Curated annotation (Swiss-Prot):
Any one Gene Ontology BP term: translation
Record-linked Pfam families: Ribosomal_S16 (PF00886)
Similarity annotation: Belongs to the bacterial ribosomal protein bS16 family.
Source taxon at top rank: Bacteria
Naturally occurring in which organism (per UniProt): Aromatoleum aromaticum (strain DSM 19018 / LMG 30748 / EbN1) (Azoarcus sp. (strain EbN1))
HAMAP family, per the entry: Ribosomal_bS16
One annotated Gene Ontology cellular component of this protein: small ribosomal subunit
Matches recorded under InterPro entries: Ribosomal_bS16, Ribosomal_bS16_CS, Ribosomal_bS16_dom_sf
GO molecular function terms noted in the UniProt entry: structural constituent of ribosome
Keywords, comma-separated and alphabetical: Ribonucleoprotein, Ribosomal protein
Record carries keyword Ribosomal protein: yes
Signal peptide: none
NCBIfam families associated with the record: S16 (TIGR00002)
Protein's name according to its UniProt entry: Small ribosomal subunit protein bS16
Length: 83
């Protein structure tokens, strides 16, 4: 099953997350199918902290991908900011 979830990157104490479509059997930070966006919780005011490709996210949802609870919250937040 395909899931859309966060893959952690960045350094110690400085998290950075890629929003990825991946097979549920793969590790959290392992192989993924496609990068759909990113989330930077430590972003400064002048930087973009959240970027989501809504078109690709919708594509994966239509093809049966399950969103993790955090990605669902972030997707709603990104849609609200874009509107």
């Amino acid at each position: 099953m395909v899931v859309i979830r966060l893959a952690r990157g960045g350094a110690k104490k400085r998290p950075f997350y890629n929003i990825v479509a991946a097979d549920s059997r793969n590790r959290r930070d392992g192989r993924f199918i496609e990068r759909v966006g990113f989330y930077n919780p430590m972003a400064a005011e002048s930087e973009k902290g959240l970027v989501v490709n809504a078109e690709r996210l919708e594509y994966w949802k239509q093809h049966g991908a399950q969103l993790s609870p955090t990605v669902l919250r972030l997707a709603k937040q990104a849609a609200k900011a874009a509107a």
